[in-house]
Amino acid sequence: MYEKSYEKEITVYQYECDVKNRMTAAALLKQVQQISTEHCDIFGLDAAYYQSTNTAFLLSKISLLFHREILVGEKLKLVTQPSLPVKAVYHRYTSAYDEQGKEAASVDSRWILVDTQTRRILRKIPENFHFPFLTEQVPEHPCKLVKSECMEHAGEQSDVYSKVDQNGHLNNTEYASIRVRYWCPFLKLLSIQYDPWCWLIIMSCVLEKQWICLWAPLKMATI
């Protein structure tokens, strides 16, 4: 069995929204994480399978784009599409469509498959690894890295039990909340009212009880 995509319908609830009844970035990422997990579970790619093959998928980069504000009570259709790896990177693109069939938001995530025993990146699909997603290419965001010319200390964040996943790592969706929490004062300072892009460049996993130091860019230069 092979499916290029998987879809489900969701309703945006109040607890997923901010003070202005807008769906938060973290809430949308949680929904994207859930539909991606469900898609993998259909083909047997669950926690037990990864453990038996000593493998794990780690998120290396993720980009979220809101085409417009998504409000409480809206019904969305999520469509997720994974692809074959390109240079050891596995892409998964997920779209959120409104009831008029227009794309309200999209998420481009990039993953790497690692050997949990040797801690090495597996640049090719292992022979004994069942990977059912055969699409060669999916849509993607222009995820260019941004070099900051000047940085200012924005704060520090400690991980806690309620925010870690089954691997003891900070849950990927929590990075969105952290970004908004420490970035909003700088957005107000720069008189930016609405930021449709939420770029989360995840370079390493944060383990439980570890601290991360956050720096906010004052001037950006694309590289």
Predicted region positions:
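Hot-dog-fold acyl-thioester-processing enzymes
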Residues: 1-59, 106-108, 115-193
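HotDog/MaoC-like acyl-thioester-processing domains
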Residues: 2-8, 63-146, 201, 205-212, ...
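Short, well-ordered coil↔helix boundary/capping segments
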Residues: 169-173, 199, 205-207
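Phosphate-/nucleic-acid-contacting segments
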Residues: 196
